[in-house]
């Protein structure tokens, strides 16, 4: 489907560029740069995998487990013999149908992705005049937009990181936010997110961690709004970071613009099989049970950290916690000496110094973390 050459912002309205939009775009471009020079590029490209290493107790990466469950590994292994052939269109159709059924959507409302990162990289194709990115949050969307020369306005939330639609510039025709939000673990009410909608604006919600919350409250994945685009990822819940699987849910016309110009066979056979397998009813039930365990582990982990005088941000809904200590970088390095990896917090726009992100883990791993913290001078209270 050819992209509309007259479409120069996310949701075309045909009213031209307003003076307010031009002014905001100029301010954002001056403040945050274009695709030519991005001084903080390395910070925006930093991810938790850079903070961990082989053999470490990993609190830095939010993937649940070290490998996919056995049944999923068997499903993928059964398709290895098919790798000598190009991906079958029937497999793509099956994957889209499975995702559509899982969320109560039509297959036309599903765009399969080679990981959530590919979805973020597609956003500049919508030609927004001014993008607003809500922070603190995952940094990949902002980087993708800025590298494409899209003016970006940062909407930085202050603790307790409550979303206020009034903070978003009215001129923004593209708004990107996470729910639940990485790294704050805040879950925004769906009604507040939909309050961001405006004529000519597209709202993109990164729900990469939504299935890590039992019942997926506040999710918009099953809602039909032509101006809301939802991004999902298989990486975290199913330990598939190395396979790169995800999908967009949204209006078919918007998905067509994102898909235009894409390379043929964007997903391979194993990726398509993984999408189909994890969208089935049994897999969804397993994911829900896992989310219940995460909630229990989180509830047990928070008081143990607080008993050491560590500030833990709440409310926390996701499979990770945002903590604050006097010298975060020193603590991160000292914990690494004890074989424990935690995620830097200073690379997230809007976070004050002293923040770290720690994945929610089970009792045995938390024991290791607490023991190391005590050895480093944190006293039980």
Map each language-model feature to its residues:
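PLP-dependent enzyme catalytic core of the Aspartate aminotransferase-like
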Residues: 2-3, 337-338, 349-381
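N-terminal "arm"/small-domain region of PLP-dependent enzymes with the aminotransferase-like
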Residues: 2-86, 98, 171, 201
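PLP-dependent aminotransferase class I/II
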Residues: 67-69, 90-93, 227-306, 310-313
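Conserved beta-loop-alpha segment that forms the PLP phosphate-binding cup at the N-terminus of a helix
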Residues: 92-95, 99, 107-131, 246
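Conserved PLP-anchoring active-site segment centered on the Schiff-base-forming lysine
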Residues: 124-146, 151, 158
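Active-site phosphate-binding strand-loop segment of PLP-dependent enzymes
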Residues: 153, 158-214
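Conserved PLP-binding catalytic core of the aspartate aminotransferase-like
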Residues: 294-295, 305-338
């Amino acid at each position: 489907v050819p992209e509309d050459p007259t479409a120069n912002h996310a949701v075309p309205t045909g009213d031209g560029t307003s003076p307010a939009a031009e002014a905001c775009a100029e301010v954002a471009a001056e403040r945050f740069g274009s695709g030519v020079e991005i001084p903080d590029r390395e910070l925006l490209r930093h991810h938790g995998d850079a903070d961990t290493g082989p053999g470490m107790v990993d609190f830095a990466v939010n993937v649940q487990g070290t490998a996919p469950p056995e049944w999923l590994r068997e499903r993928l292994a059964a398709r290895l013999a098919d790798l000598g052939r190009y991906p079958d269109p029937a497999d793509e159709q099956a994957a889209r149908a499975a995702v559509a059924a899982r969320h109560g959507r039509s297959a036309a409302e599903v765009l399969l992705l080679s990981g959530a990162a590919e979805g973020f990289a597609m956003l500049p194709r919508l030609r927004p005049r001014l993008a607003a990115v809500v922070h603190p949050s995952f940094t990949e969307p902002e980087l993708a937009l800025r590298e494409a020369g899209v003016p970006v306005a940062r909407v930085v939330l202050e603790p307790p990181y409550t979303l206020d639609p009034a903070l978003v510039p009215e001129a923004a025709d593209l708004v990107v936010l996470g729910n639940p939000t990485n790294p704050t673990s805040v879950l925004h009410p769906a009604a507040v997110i939909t309050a961001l909608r405006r004529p000519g604006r597209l709202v993109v919600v990164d729900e990469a961690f939504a299935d890590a919350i039992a019942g997926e409250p506040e999710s918009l994945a099953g809602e039909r709004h032509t101006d809301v685009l939802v991004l999902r990822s298989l990486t975290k819940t199913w330990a598939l970071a190395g396979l790169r699987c995800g999908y967009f849910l949204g209006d078919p016309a918007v998905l067509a613009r994102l898909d235009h110009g894409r390379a043929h066979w964007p997903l391979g056979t194993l990726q398509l099989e993984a999408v189909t397998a994890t969208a089935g009813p049994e897999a969804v039930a397993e994911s829900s049970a896992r989310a219940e365990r995460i909630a229990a582990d989180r509830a047990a982990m928070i008081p143990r950290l607080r008993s050491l005088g560590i500030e833990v941000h709440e409310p926390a809904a996701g499979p990770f916690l945002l903590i604050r200590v006097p010298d975060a970088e020193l603590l991160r390095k000292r914990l690494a000496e004890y074989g424990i990896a935690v995620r830097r917090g200073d690379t997230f726009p809007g976070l004050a110094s002293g923040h770290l992100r720690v994945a929610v883990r089970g009792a045995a791993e938390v024991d290791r973390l607490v023991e190391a913290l005590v050895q480093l001078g944190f006293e039980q209270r």
